[in-house]
Each structure stands twice: as structure tokens, then as C-alpha cells.
């Protein structure tokens, strides 16, 4: 078991769940089988983060660009959200606060209702914050924040010259939460894919050559240990 270092505000991790389709293709299975296995891994890794004492974790589940995939695949993914990410996770018996990041207005009303209820029911929890990014994109999030501040400026609530980084951060979906200390991407890919672009300014990047459906608790231990040995300078020396 990994032992996260002591950080101000606790350890915060971003995870890009990547490789479901390739995992299925390598086994001659439909892509939906990879997403199902990936959802099972999500549950286990989320539980493990809680057991490790991680303060907050951000899972990239569905991007704004993922709508471009075949309708059958998108439909299957949406069903998995309800079955695994929401209904199938033991939230009630864990001290976990749930937050959903992204534009949920494009999602099925039933799914939206489930998401809203989960956030409300867990709002008073004091343990780890579990963030699930659904219909999320880093650029749209920044545009949304800028529009909110522009509207306030137009209404005379703030002056444009007073807008600063903290005000932008407070207008993000992640308002009030710590930026990720490191972002983990399985599958061997080396890009952020529009994930937490504002919040990742000084996040360490940890890439691993394992597809998400094969990802284990031991792999997370390895990622945390690698991060523990990084020297973060935040632009200094």
C-alpha cells in the first residue's frame, strides 16, 4: 500500500481513464465490454483512494468530444454511468462527498436527477471528495467561467480590471477544491485530452503503460510513489 506524503489540503489526484476500447479490441470483444470492465476498475480504485486517505480525486469519465463516437457506444456508456458510477457504488456506507463536473444539461433527465440527488445526499460528508467528470471539457469550462465573470462585469457587480486568477478558479466546476497534485494517465498516451486545463497548471503528469481495465491498486501505489519522488518547483528553482 502506498503512503501519500503529507500535503497542505491533502493529496489530490486526477485520473484519465483511458484504454477501454483498446483493451476490448485486443481481446476480440466489443468496445462496450471494455467500458464495462473500466467501470468496475473505477469503483475499486475510488474505494482504494478513500482507504489511502486521498483528499480528492478527479475521474475523467466522458468528455465533450466523446459524443462523436458511435451512437450505440455512447448509449452503452450512459447506461454504465447509472449502473456503475452511480447505482453500483457504495456511497452511503462511506464518508465520501460526490461532485459531478461538466455540463449535465445534455444528459438524460433521469441521469441528471440521480446525479443531483447524489450530490445533495453526500454534501455533508467530510471525507474524500470524489469528482466524476461527465460531458466535461477543460476549454468549455474556462469559457463558462469567463462568461460568468463577463456577465457580472456587465451587471456592474465587478470591474473587469479586478478579475484575477482566484476569481477564475472560483468560477470553475472545481470551485473550493484543491488542484490535482498529479494527473495519472494509463494507456501510455502522453496528453491531457482537454482535462482540467486550468487546474493542471502545476500538476505533475504520471503516464503508465497499462490500459485502464487492467489498472490495479498496485498500479496506483506505483503512481503515488513516483509522484512522492518528484521535486515540485512551481516555477521556482
State the predicted function of each range.
Residues 1-237:
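Flexible, compositionally biased loop and terminal segments
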Amino acid at each position: 500500500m502506498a503512503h501519500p506524503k503529507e500535503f497542505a489540503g491533502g493529496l489530490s489526484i486526477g485520473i484519465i481513464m483511458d484504454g477501454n476500447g483498446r483493451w476490448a479490441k485486443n481481446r476480440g470483444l466489443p468496445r462496450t465490454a471494455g467500458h464495462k470492465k473500466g467501470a468496475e476498475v473505477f469503483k475499486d480504485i475510488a474505494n482504494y483512494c478513500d482507504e489511502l486517505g486521498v483528499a480528492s480525486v478527479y475521474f475523467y469519465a466522458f468528455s465533450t468530444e466523446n459524443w462523436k463516437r458511435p451512437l450505440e457506444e455512447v448509449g452503452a456508456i450512459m447506461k454504465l454511468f447509472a449502473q456503475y458510477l452511480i447505482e453500483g457504488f457504495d456511497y452511503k456506507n462511506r464518508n465520501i462527498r460526490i461532485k459531478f463536473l461538466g455540463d449535465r444539461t445534455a444528459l438524460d433527465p433521469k441521469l441528471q436527477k440521480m446525479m443531483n440527488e447524489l450530490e445533495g445526499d453526500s454534501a455533508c460528508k467530510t471525507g474524500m471528495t470524489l469528482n466524476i467528470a461527465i460531458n466535461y471539457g477543460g476549454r468549455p469550462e474556462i469559457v463558462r467561467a469567463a462568461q460568468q465573470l463577463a456577465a457580472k462585469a456587465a451587471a456592474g457587480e465587478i470591474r473587469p480590471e479586478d478579475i484575477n486568477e482566484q476569481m477564475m478558479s472560483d468560477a470553475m466546476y472545481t470551485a473550493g477544491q484543491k488542484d490535482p497534485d498529479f494527473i495519472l494517465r494509463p494507456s501510455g498516451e502522453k496528453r491531457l485530452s482537454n482535462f482540467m486545463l486550468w487546474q493542471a497548471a502545476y500538476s505533475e503528469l504520471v503516464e503508465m503503460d497499462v490500459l485502464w481495465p487492467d489498472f490495479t491498486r498496485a498500479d496506483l501505489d506505483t503512481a503515488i510513489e513516483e509522484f512522492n519522488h518528484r521535486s515540485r518547483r512551481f516555477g521556482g528553482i
